[in-house]
Amino acid sequence: MIEQTIFEYLGGKLSVPVRMEEEPDMPDEYVLIEKTGGEKTNYISRATIAIQSYAKSLYRAMQINEDVKAALEEIVTLDEISRCSLNSDYNYTDTTRKKYRYQAVFDIVHY
């Protein structure tokens, strides 16, 4: 599963916790991974992955987002990843829960 690969990879690269879902008592700073789409043709899989960076300030959420982008630029060094490109990234503050958040969306080709 591509989510597991990204989870393990980012867990070793980032200074904040990486999660695949919200848990009780989340820390002030963390990253969530979510697969938002994908397809498979001729044994080659493509996935769209959204990575949300949370923090107590908008500036810190933006910094974590930059760390995520820098880390994923290097994920192609893994054998199972052949391409990773940034689709978009933007301020995605959760106004309902009053939590600062940035989101980066990546298109990943993997085996």
PLM features per residue range, with description:
Residues 52-54:
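Short hydrophobic/aromatic beta-strand micro-patches
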Residues 1-41, 59, 63-70, 75, ...:
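Small/polar-rich, solvent-exposed N-terminal microdomains that initiate assembly or binding
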Residues 1-12, 25-26, 36-46, 86-111:
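Short, charged interaction patches at domain edges and termini
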Residues 20, 80-91:
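Short, conserved loop-to-beta-strand elements that form functional interface hotspots
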Residues 49:
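Residue-level detector of short, conserved catalytic/binding motifs and their immediate flanks
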